[in-house]
């Protein structure tokens, strides 16, 4: 609270408030990047005290407060000198969870005390220098390396790697030590999980129960990306709502984003926050190398705009910022008034992943009642049977039906309610479509309530407490609820029992209100009264007025305590008529009509099952209103008569596919949008029989439906797999119509008395020719683009893979193409694209050129391709952009403007590119060699493989490969990308936007995989080889496998390239040759080679799907073959490490660790960053007779056939790592060409993507 007069407050509160009323205050910048500038080694971290500590300590920055305190104090002083008002202690990881990584949990107290003392002494020094500008120490409480809201296990969404109580204990230890060390402020920062933060705030409150005076508490959350959410999925506003009741002095955002990206989220926080607001962004987003590029001047300009817009009270810097940044911030904000705290109308606000604000527009808030073991037999049975995932469907249905809050009740004699509610809440936490709404924890057992409070990151509701337990226990329970930050339902009960009359209801509620607001400190808007909805029409006269008593009590409560809310369990009203759901629902609807008018704000209802008041039959409405309002003496009797005459124990719930009853055009559109092929033939036939011609069916309902698909895809409401399924439906329909169209054409020709083919083709938006260029066999992306364009009424002519330029030219002419698109995956394709562009220019074509594929980029298109073709040349990032680009290129009104915009943009890119080449610095090849990877080969004895020569495997187990699949690239192929916290497999399934479609796609993939394995539709095979080897500089000399002892017969050389980008540090300039013992060392080393493919049989699969007009299955097969090829490479490499080379015999890694390369050795591939020259593949093919042994072919352009193939080189060196050669100079190109005995021009052609200078393409 900003203007708190709490007598327990420290003097710091008043001082900081006064300064904040006058100016924007400044926090320090990054600690980690400043520490990095000292280039500390492991011994520096150890110091004298820990020199013999048995675990590695490098990177434990918090430990430096003990071992290198002068460095930490120096950094503090630099920030203070730059103008910081607040400096943070060096304790971001000063908790038992993070220190456990270093086996240093026992040092947590010391680290925090000493860190606080270091910062305090620095602040005191600078305050003494200028007493008019006091400096303050913020005790940094980091997020820990655990998350209480996210499961660490794919298979067990309810699992957690830390629990609330464990977090509280860990945070309490840290807070106690920081305060002992002398901090002025507690800063809970970089919060990525609100439940972790709530645990920290709970611990802080526990601490201040016994310690005085209180210190100010700041909280700073982290929005992880442009989706505007924390890692655990909450929006910034929802996070603020979760912690707002903790009497924070400051709430803000830090880390993950640069200032520009953070601005919209900061603005939202600034609007809703009733405390001071802070922000300390990163120095921009991380660059390619993980660094930060925004200069102090750049950031200061953005910070100044924040301040001028009234968004800031405190500003600082996070990752990548320095004392220079802080100095620039101080100068930028000087003289700008601080943000004014907004005066907001007090309102009840709750949160799940998203906030729920009780505005007037909401009218009435539905609390879903079906997750109640007492009220739903189905839910109870699922919980008892331990079927929690199925039970989630009950909650999901409630949300989908309109519930804005979910009530959860586990009170049942045969259920362990504490365990059940925690487990179910953890399951819900992994389901964003459910956890987006707030939770109501419903139990008569307070232990169950508190157990639930420890599992929910949002601001929830406790249902309920009451005075029936006595005033002392009521207050105790209320204080606990408040400490967890929840709102509370208070029942109209007291020591004498349940209130039934209006007067008793109002009296008990008012008494409860006074206690909660005056003795416990509850805000009125966090109090929800339940004045007891009791059962009417029971046959007992005294019950007849219960409805009226509730309605009138509600009216008075709202007049007496207007900021509070009124709720109730609506189904209690009709309990007498259990089993007659239509009657009960009519009673509920009519009751709410009057109760809402009296001021009832919310109620526990079966969301989605309430009829509209005006839709209730008039005769029934009169009966239920007579009973509810107690208008006649015989109301109960008449209602009972009606119930007996109209007894319907169950609603007729026949699942009818209603869309099948719609007109045929709507059925076709529905089938296209939903991807349903079941009825498309019969619907198409029906349309053909009702429309003038078969062509009319295509141009009418089919294209109409596809237009809807195109619009939905363009608006982001459909995703790529759905679009491809739509195309499958379309193709099946068209295939059915083609014979009829041919017959109609024949009859027309007969009518005209000639045999000339009629040209009544369906209208289209334009003709697009697509081709994978010569030498390249990869076409998944191109095929997807073709489908998407086809769905948007473009006629697509796909001329396949490995397409020579002349064939592309012929297709353009023959089909009168409006646009041509070139695709390629491998680096040599880039030169082929340049050649095609040059030929199109020479032949004076006037159509636009689109460039796409994994190896292409906007900068390459602008610099290398566009200058060779005078017509519009556009790089298309993925299929989702293709439609917009083609539309823009062909739009008669705007195509010239679009082309000019692209041309201007590409000209600017070229200018920047050439300017950057001038600015980059490269070291000479000789100097780079002198600074190669240093290895003491005298101490290393390389492991000899178990055999030398080659080994062929003709049929690798597909079952084993399925278990090794990395699914993340699979979803990238289909252009499905989740947002935090749901990026990557399997969390993508939880993503609000793409999760459902990703799961469907994954299920389809599993079905096809099973068929592939069961029927052996694909064959996985390959060859591996091991050879004696030594290195000379960058190159690896390979000897005959029968010449291991003398090594006198070199049989081949693998040529390498060395990094030349000048480095600011003493890091080595790496080449692959560094990982093999040099010839001069005398050490016998070895190298491995491999080539594998899982693509044998793929052509047959694709051909079958093409005949069935099934693009979806065709693309799926290719995507799975690619995944299986990568899995094969991973599996064989594992076999090599454990058996064939056997340098890690006992290794047993999880898939996750495999994909993260947590093993010794690497397997780089020619054509990739460590050796970008594809022609090195020829050496692999020659040495191992790959073509003869496996039938994997190599094209002239170094593409492998089948395309689902992987090849590379095995290194066993323990320090070998993947790296990127980066740009190289002409000097190295000349050396490389000379060693390899090729021309300089040929070397430049194959290495064009990494040249540090420009060169002309080869003329063909």
From Swiss-Prot:
Annotated Hcy-binding domain ranges read 13-333
Q: Does the keyword Repeat apply?
A: yes
Note on cofactor: Binds 1 zinc ion per subunit.
Locate the B12-binding N-terminal domain: which residues?
Answer: 655-749
Q: Name one GO molecular function term.
A: cobalamin binding
Disulfide linkages recorded for this protein, renumbered to the chain, are none
The record's InterPro entries line, in alphabetical order, gives: Cbl-bd_cap, Cobalamin-bd, Cobalamin-bd_sf, Dihydropteroate_synth-like_sf, HCY_dom, HCY_dom_sf, Met_Synthase/Corrinoid, Met_synthase_B12-bd
Is GTP-binding one of the keywords? Answer: no
Q: Which reaction(s) are listed as its catalytic activity?
A: (6S)-5-methyl-5,6,7,8-tetrahydrofolate + L-homocysteine = (6S)-5,6,7,8-tetrahydrofolate + L-methionine
UniProt domain B12-binding: residue ranges: 766-883
For this UniProt record, the keywords arranged alphabetically read as follows: Amino-acid biosynthesis, Cobalamin, Cobalt, Metal-binding, Methionine biosynthesis, Methyltransferase, Repeat, S-adenosyl-L-methionine, Transferase, Zinc
Q: Where does methylcob(III)alamin bind?
A: 699, 775-779, 823, 827, 879
E.C. designation(s):
2.1.1.13
- Cofactor(s) needed: methylcob(III)alamin; Zn(2+)
The protein's matches in Pfam families, at most eight in alphabetical order, are given as: B12-binding (PF02310), B12-binding_2 (PF02607), Met_synt_B12 (PF02965), Pterin_bind (PF00809), S-methyl_trans (PF02574)
Pathway field: Amino-acid biosynthesis; L-methionine biosynthesis via de novo pathway; L-methionine from L-homocysteine (MetH route): step 1/1
Q: Which CDD domains match?
A: methionine_synthase_B12_BD, MeTr
Return the broad EC class.
Answer: transferase
Query: What residue stretches are annotated with the AdoMet activation domain?
Result: 916-1256
Pinpoint the Pterin-binding domain residues.
Answer: 364-625
Name the job this protein performs. Answer: Catalyzes the transfer of a methyl group from methyl-cobalamin to homocysteine, yielding enzyme-bound cob(I)alamin and methionine. Subsequently, remethylates the cofactor using methyltetrahydrofolate.
Misc remark for this entry? L-homocysteine is bound via the zinc atom.
Indicate the family of this protein: Belongs to the vitamin-B12 dependent methionine synthase family.
Q: What is recorded about the protein's domains? A: Modular enzyme with four functionally distinct domains. The isolated Hcy-binding domain catalyzes methyl transfer from free methylcobalamin to homocysteine. The Hcy-binding domain in association with the pterin-binding domain catalyzes the methylation of cob(I)alamin by methyltetrahydrofolate and the methylation of homocysteine. The B12-binding domain binds the cofactor. The AdoMet activation domain binds S-adenosyl-L-methionine. Under aerobic conditions cob(I)alamin can be converted to inactive cob(II)alamin.
Which PANTHER family is this protein grouped with?
A: METHIONINE SYNTHASE
Designated name of the protein: Methionine synthase
State which gene encodes it: mtr
